[in-house]
Amino acid sequence: MKAGKVWGTTELIEANGALEFHRIEMEAGGICSKHLHRYKWNGFYVESGKMLVRVWQRDYDLVDETIVGPGQYTKVKPGLYHQFECLESGVAYELYWAEFNHNDIVRESVGEMKTELISDFEIRLDSDDSYHLYLQEG
């Protein structure tokens, strides 16, 4: 289902617990709102047309601007204000995803192998020159 925006239209392709994927039709001169995502990355892949992506760095006076053309991709880290402007009408794809920490495990105990402890045994060298383990009866 397409949703109208001031700058064009967006169509949700997929949304699940790991990502969100949209096809956007952008109109020259259109500018999306300046916004941020607390936890999600935001990626832009341009199929046709041209897009300017602005990213306000944590030092609010520093603004990075990236022009993305056909076949090019850029991404914005979570927590940074950003905005796109359509320089030439076209089609782009917008992708949102969150990263998980590969080292997020907290261990309460250490793994182990259960074994029975044998305390009463004897090792003997037999007549065939091999060692054998004998349990002592007691």
Predicted regions and their residues:
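Conserved hydrophobic/aromatic beta-strand scaffold that supports enzyme active sites
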Residues: 21-25, 43, 65, 73-75
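Double-stranded beta-helix
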Residues: 85-138
